[in-house]
């Protein structure tokens, strides 16, 4: 998967920050989509998931919908999608809360272009590895076949199918 096909969704209500992030990433060959508010961001996400999302924690100063709500929305659709949360008013609790909800990284403004690119490149690589891992797991799971159609074999097959989709360890 080359970098040209990687699509990044940048969500920030601050036009200058949004354009700066977009410019840095475009210069490195990424395809960029932008959103400036909650409603627009949800529309973009529902239209097509990006490879990585960069979301400002504090959006829509007039409303109560913010970047955390967008993070939660994305994770319901695709738990593996890397989301980088950014904030100009960050504190440790905000960072911890974001990471607990599934954020890939948390960056405080201002940040260097090197740090931004590092996080985005790692996010893209992480997503690629998770997709490959799922593909290989599916291939492995489907390469073993049970012979028979008895009630017990069917129950075992159903149970294995459910267990194979779980993120946690099964003992």
Predicted feature residues:
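A Lys-centered signature of the CheY-like receiver
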Residues: 101, 109, 149
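AAA+ ATPase active-site-proximal loops
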Residues: 137-171
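C-terminal output helix
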Residues: 91-93, 107, 111-120
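Active-site beta3 strand of CheY-like receiver
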Residues: 48-54, 59, 84
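Two-component/phosphorelay signaling modules centered on CheY-like receiver
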Residues: 15-33
């Amino acid at each position: 998967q080359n970098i040209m096909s990687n699509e990044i969704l940048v969500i920030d209500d601050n036009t200058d920050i949004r354009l700066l992030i977009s410019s840095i990433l475009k210069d490195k060959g990424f395809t960029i989509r932008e959103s400036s508010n909650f409603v627009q961001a949800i529309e973009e996400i529902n239209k097509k998931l990006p490879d990585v999302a960069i979301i400002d924690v504090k959006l829509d100063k007039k409303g109560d919908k913010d970047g955390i709500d967008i993070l939660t929305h994305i994770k319901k659709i695709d738990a593996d999608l890397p989301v980088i949360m950014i904030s100009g008013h960050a504190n440790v609790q905000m960072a911890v809360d974001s990471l607990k909800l599934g954020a890939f990284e948390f960056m405080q403004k201002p940040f260097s272009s090197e740090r931004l690119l590092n996080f985005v490149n790692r996010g893209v690589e992480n997503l690629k590895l998770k997709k490959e891992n799922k593909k290989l797991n599916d291939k492995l799971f489907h390469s073993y076949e049970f012979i028979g159609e008895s009630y017990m074999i069917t129950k075992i097959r159903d149970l294995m199918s459910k267990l194979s989709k779980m993120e946690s360890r099964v003992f």
